[in-house]
């Protein structure tokens, strides 16, 4: 199949390429030619079969669906375009493997994409996963926004299961420093503006506020997904029978585990979901929502209720640092920086947020 023939990412099963409300620029002509070569080489390794679909590319990972000639089920093939993307897929593969081995509820284990083959150290590197059923939550909301409340309830039910697998509460400063230090360093290293006076002041204010909040108030420590957005949640198609369980959409899969952490702050996932809803339903970027939360002292969504400012800021830090770490293109995307990153640090630099 030609790489030039591309389909919306959701048709490949939950592969989303949205970054805080702004799409990245897809690969140009040269990039598409390289993708053609990648798929040709990977196809030889996979054996007899054909490419069914190739996702529109907005990240550093080329994603395609392969149908084996022997009649077996289709698989999702992920081809990293950069070293950062290779490392992200390694993290995703390893996180899924470890989490699957620790999960006791079999229903939750079934939501994880199984690794069919991993050749991330080969040339070309590739990760092959099973295709999970379902429609991505963001696609479902675009069709039926009135389902936002039930979808959030179903999503948080999955979170309760995930977060209940292990962990406990902590105010350990060393653990908090581990959460914050690396992610703040990513912003400073990747974004030149963050190394200037205003950016540095914003980062220092962010670190001071979050460290104080997370060490003064107990924080649940457990498995965190790290990018828990509606687009990474797969749900039973509305046309399926039955499409709901007790009035809630049925979750059929949870994908994109590159930002997962075995001992992360549980609050990140719920706040990430709330911020993603703000973009999907209201068209408000993460930056706009965080500035409003900084001024109000809380993040409010009708589907999730009020969330502490520290939860929202931690989710924002997880989001922007994760994107910058997975692709250097974010640091060069002026629109993304202007709408998602700079306003938050500028607001932090201008006024220190109040503690709870």
Model segments located where?
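Juxta-kinase regulatory segment immediately upstream of eukaryotic protein kinase catalytic domains
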Residues: 2-52
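An alpha-helical support segment within catalytic cores of ATP-dependent transferases
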Residues: 33-50, 168-225, 236-238, 243-246
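ATP-binding glycine-rich phosphate-binding loop
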Residues: 41-69
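ATP-binding glycine-rich loop module of kinase domains
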Residues: 60-90
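A conserved alpha-helical element in kinase catalytic cores
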Residues: 79-124, 143-161
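Conserved kinase catalytic-core helix
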Residues: 99-106, 133-176, 207, 213-217, ...
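Conserved short submotifs of the Hanks-type protein kinase catalytic core
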Residues: 124-136
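Active-site activation/catalytic loop segments of kinase-like enzymes and analogous catalytic loops
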Residues: 268-304, 316-331
């Amino acid at each position: 199949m030609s790489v030039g023939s591309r389909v919306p990412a959701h048709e490949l099963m939950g592969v989303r390429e949205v970054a805080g409300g702004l799409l990245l620029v897809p690969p140009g002509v040269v990039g598409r030619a390289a993708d053609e070569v990648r798929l040709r080489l990977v196809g030889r390794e996979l054996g007899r079969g054909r490419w069914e679909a190739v996702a529109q590319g907005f990240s550093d990972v080329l994603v395609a669906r392969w149908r084996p000639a022997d009649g077996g089920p289709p698989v999702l093939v992920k081809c990293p375009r950069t070293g950062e993307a290779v490392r992200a897929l390694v993290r995703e593969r390893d996180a899924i493997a470890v989490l699957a081995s620790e999960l006791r509820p079999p229903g939750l284990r079934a939501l994880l994409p199984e690794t069919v083959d991993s050749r991330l150290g080969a040339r070309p590197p590739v990760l092959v996963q099973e295709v999970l059923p379902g429609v991505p939550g963001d696609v479902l909301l675009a069709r039926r926004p009135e389902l936002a409340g039930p979808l959030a309830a179903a999503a948080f039910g999955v979170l309760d299961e995930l977060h209940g697998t292990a962990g406990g509460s902590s105010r350990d400063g060393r653990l908090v420093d581990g959460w914050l230090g690396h992610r703040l360093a990513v912003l400073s290293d990747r974004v030149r503006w963050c190394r200037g006076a205003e950016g540095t002041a914003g980062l220092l204010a962010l670190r001071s506020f979050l460290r104080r909040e997370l060490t003064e108030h107990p924080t649940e420590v457990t498995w965190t997904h790290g990018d828990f957005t509606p687009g990474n949640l797969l749900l039973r198609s509305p046309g399926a029978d039955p499409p709901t369980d007790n009035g809630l959409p049925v979750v059929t899969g949870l994908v994109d585990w590159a930002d997962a952490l075995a001992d992360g702050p549980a609050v990140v996932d719920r706040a990430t979901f709330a911020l993603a809803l703000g973009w999907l339903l209201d068209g408000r970027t993460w930056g706009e929502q965080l500035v409003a939360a900084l001024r109000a002292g809380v993040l409010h969504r009708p589907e999730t209720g009020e969330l502490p400012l520290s939860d929202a800021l931690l989710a924002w830090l997880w989001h922007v640092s994760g994107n910058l770490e997975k692709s250097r293109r974010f640091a060069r995307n002026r629109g993304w920086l202007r709408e998602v990153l700079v306003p938050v640090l500028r607001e932090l630099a201008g006024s220190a947020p109040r503690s709870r």
